[in-house]
Amino acid sequence: MVYRLKDDVEEISNIRLGYTGRFVDDSFKATEYNLTVEHASDFPSLDGFSLDDYYNRDNLSSGWFKIQKNVDKYTVTKNIHSAYAEATYQFTPRWIVNLGLKYDYVDINVDYNVNRGGSEGSNTIRKDYFLPSLNLKYNLNEKHSLRLGASKTYTLPQAKEISPYRYVGVNFNSQGNPNLKPSDNYNFDLKWDFNPSPTELVSLTAFYKHIKDPISRIEVASAGGYLSYENISDRATVAGVEVEIRKNLFVRPLSCAANGMNKLSFGLNG
């Protein structure tokens, strides 16, 4: 829902109100079959041994080995309700301000019975998030502008990160952690934009992020050795600089573009 506001400049000022919902159901099931030798002393020599010669229907009926079936499964239900309000106002030809406030209600439920019944239970994450944001834009002239942004966001654990199912791969094993907490992120950035033409851009951004309860993959010291996920500290910080360039290498008039191509552009981001 958008309400237009009157300003004395470009009349881009407005207020937006809205709601979004995200509803996700993730389910996982892994079936494992274990073939166990019943008479180990009578097991044939490994010289010239063939699995098909031993593990077959006749030997199963004769009791030479048995088959054990195990099913590991988990489900993750994620419901997120979001309501937001956002206001944009252009005070002068140079100054534009955008203010926003978003409310999220997060409800995540994990049910699991994994690792041959060794890990069975459930876990719930229910949280309210109030997420403010502020964006300021100052037009130095027609081609140069400065932007300042500040916001709060959050990062939720993925389904595989909060289920204790142990995945056995060729090169590594990994297991989720049902006790993971979401991370809170406080973001700040300052950006300079230069537009040599309407389709070209040179941009330089300095950013800073403060993270509460950051989530990371770790290696667990154990006899088997596996990877898992943890809130590795109370807080963490990330800072850096980003450069983006979009440049037209050549532009041809439409009358000269017989093959339909009238522009070739180059882009760089790093």
Please annotate each region the language model reported.
Residues 1-111, 139, 245-248, 253, ...:
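Face-selective signature of the C-terminal outer-membrane beta-barrel domain
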Residues 1, 79-85, 130-136, 146, ...:
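Hydrophobic, lipid-facing positions within transmembrane beta-strands of outer-membrane proteins
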Residues 25, 73-79, 124-129, 180-184, ...:
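Short sequence motifs at beta-strands and strand-loop junctions characteristic
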Residues 68-73, 115-123, 169, 173-178, ...:
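Extracellular loop and loop/strand-boundary signature of outer-membrane beta-barrel proteins
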Residues 62, 107, 142-187, 203-229:
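Surface-exposed extracellular loop regions of Gram-negative outer-membrane beta-barrel proteins
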